[in-house]
Amino acid sequence: MSTSFAELDPRINEPIIHDYFARLNQSDFIATANLFSEQGVLKPPFEKMITGRRAIAQYLEKEALGMKVFPIYIKTTMGDQNYTQYQVQGKVKTNYFAVNASWLINLNTTREIILVEIKLLESLSSLLELKHHPTFII
């Protein structure tokens, strides 16, 4: 079953946020990385920050293949004058498990992603169980 990003929550209407999740779900990791500014940062859970489009694309190709993300809720706040911040909550699914997650996404004034910070919203015991799953890397 294919669900478009917009079908999940019509209040989520920022095109760059839409494209980030849509391209990620299509496993189009180069296009996903190209939504970031040249020095944009991806901060995955339990990992060091990945900086730059090329490094982000390489990381996603290695770690996100087969994952689907389902954003459900978004809250927008103004950062300083240089960025807008979006807090998105939803799910990450693989063939083997699903977890609740949140994405903190900052867009600069030219509508490029400058930061995506991903957090898993699960209990420690649930995360430890996933750690032993062969397809989950933390």
Where are these regions (language model features)?
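A beta-strand edge to alpha-helix "cap/lid" segment located at domain peripheries
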Residues: S2-S4, A57, E61-I138
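Hydrophobic pocket/interface hotspot
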Residues: Y20, T32-A33, G40, G52, ...
